[in-house]
Every structure is written in structure tokens, then in C-alpha cells.
Amino acid sequence: MKIVEIKHPLVRHKLGLMRICDISTKRFRELSSELGSLLTYVATDDLEVEIVTIKGWCGLVKIARIKGKKITVVPILRAGLGMMNGVLEHLPSARISIIGIYRNEITFEPIPYFHKLVSNINERMAMVLDPMLATGGSIIATIDLLKKFGCNNIKVLSIVAAPEGIKALEEKHPDIELYLASIDQKINKNGYIIPGFGDAGDKTFGTK
């Protein structure tokens, strides 16, 4: 599995701000979007481009254009929504597929409850968004569903991840690509990433 931990100073700075205990909902939401944007910049580095000729202000000009790449952005409800706008800044024409999964707080097992996928998803590259890769259960379940519908070109964008979750993901889906801002220390007995930044869904939506 391709794993890319982005250590750019801007990424490290913004992630540090997200870890502040009493960060406001507004600021956490802004930073989630900004990191989604920065992760997308790196994750799309291998998109093919073609040279086309357009009419510019001074006549005909040759420009580069992304070559026929169909993309679907797949935020995992609900925390993945916080990253979505930042991703769409770079990919404004991407179609959006929604997958809803919640975690059983006792067993930590993922429980899918909703999905709405774009048409012809088997022809698209999917960019899965989830700010936290803890046990890996939700992301694994999402990829299972995407592959069930024939989508095998998958990239995962997470902000923080635990080594345990990365290992589980790699064992189940070694063919995907993972882009993240930080590989943190571990997950605790409650299934949260340490140091992490707490519950990303609650911090994004202002809930408890």
C-alpha cells in the first residue's frame, strides 16, 4: 500500500492548531477544509494531463489540461464532510458519493447505514475522505462497498492515523493509496487516536 505522510510546514502548522483542546467549531472546520485542500494537492500529483490549443488574448496558446479523469469524492459521514470543500476547491467538477457509517462504541465495529454512489463509479477514481484513521474499520467498510460496485481505483485522504489502523487497512486493501498529515502514536482503549484531536465529527459540527 502506498502511504504518503505529508510533512510540509503548512500541514504541520495547521495540524498543530487542530490539536488545541479548546479550539472553536468554526476554526476546526476551517482547518479541516484547508488540510483537505493540501492533501488533495499531493494526492492528485499523478493525474495525467494533455496539451490542447485554446484561443488566448494574444492568439492561439497551448495549455495543459487534466486528461479525461473521472473522479468521485467520497466523504464518510459525518466527519468527512469537514474536508470536502477543501478538496472541491481543486476538483470543482468532481461528482460526490456519500457513505454513512457509524462506529459501535462498545465493539468499535463499523455499521454502514446509508450510501448514495454516483453512476458509473466503476469508471472513476474515488477519493475517500475521513479525518481520522483509528482502527480502520470505517474506511475498510467504505472501500469494501466501493469495490463491491466495481470501483478499484481508490485513494484515502485522512488527517491523522494510528499505526494500528494503517496496518489493518494495508492487510485488507493493499492496493489503495493513503495520504495523511500525521501518523500518530496509537489508539487508546476507547478507540481514539493519541494524541489525535478528539472526535472530529463533534468538533466539526459542534456536538457532544
Swiss-Prot record:
One of its GO terms (biological process) is uracil salvage. Belongs to the UPRTase family. Catalyzes the conversion of uracil and 5-phospho-alpha-D-ribose 1-diphosphate (PRPP) to UMP and diphosphate. Uracil binds at I193, G198, D199, A200. Its EC number is 2.4.2.9. Its cofactor is Mg(2+). Binds 1 Mg(2+) ion per subunit. The magnesium is bound as Mg-PRPP. Gene3D superfamilies: 3.40.50.2020. GO terms for molecular function: GTP binding; magnesium ion binding; uracil phosphoribosyltransferase activity. The lineage of its organism: Bacteria, Pseudomonadati, Pseudomonadota, Gammaproteobacteria, Enterobacterales. It catalyses: UMP + diphosphate = 5-phospho-alpha-D-ribose 1-diphosphate + uracil. HAMAP family: Upp_B. It is an enzyme of class 2 (transferase). Pathway: Pyrimidine metabolism; UMP biosynthesis via salvage pathway; UMP from uracil: step 1/1. Keywords: Allosteric enzyme, Glycosyltransferase, GTP-binding, Magnesium, Nucleotide-binding, Transferase. Allosterically activated by GTP. The gene is upp. Signal peptide: none annotated. InterPro entries: PRibTrfase_dom, PRTase-like, Upp_B, UPRTase/APRTase, Ura_phspho_trans. 5-phospho-alpha-D-ribose 1-diphosphate binds at R78, R103, D130, P131, M132, L133, A134, T135, G136, G137, S138, D199. It comes from Blochmanniella pennsylvanica (strain BPEN). This is Uracil phosphoribosyltransferase.
